[in-house]
Amino acid sequence: MSLKEKTYSVLVVSASQNLITSMHDLLSGSKYETVKYTASVSSAKRANLEKAYDIVIIDTPLPDETGDDLAIDLSTNEASIVMMLVHYDLYDEIHENYSKYGIFVASKPTSDEILAHSLNWLESARERTRSYEKKTLSIEDKMQEIRLVNQAKLMLITEKGMAEDEAHKYISKQAMDRCVTKGVIANEILNK
């Protein structure tokens, strides 16, 4: 599946009407399923409680806070990819301090072209985190199956008097003979 087929939810946190207008034009494509605009850190936090966003763009400073803590919270506690827009004379310092959290930093003033390229980078980063999320789920599924098989083996050992290797072979053979996973067989054994 190409990136063009993926969809993203985006939260733009900015008190600048110019940036909101630019972002509105850039985010009008079909690949952006949900786009929310907020003008303060407090409203961004409320929006994030309602829905986790794939991409968060924070135009600093904001009326109620700078947005730094929000960026750190979203990048470390959520699966969101975060970009901060900072004044050009603060860029080096902010980048140095916030890149360790995986936060992208861009300087402003900026152009629509640079914002468009930045969105492409943010999408690429989000796809990378999605692949890690899938791998994590896959590993968790495998661990759950191992737990089920071990419980089923214990049941076969205690109730049927099988040795551990016999119970293991029994579950494996049943799974092979019936073309199902060991987890399915383990579930059946546990539910008898």
Question: Could you tell me what each predicted segment is?
Answer:
Residues 20, 44, 54-75, 89:
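Conserved phosphotransfer microenvironments
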Residues 110-119:
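C-terminal output helix
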Residues 120-134:
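The C-terminal output helix
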Residues 6-18, 23-27, 56:
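Conserved acidic segment of CheY-like receiver
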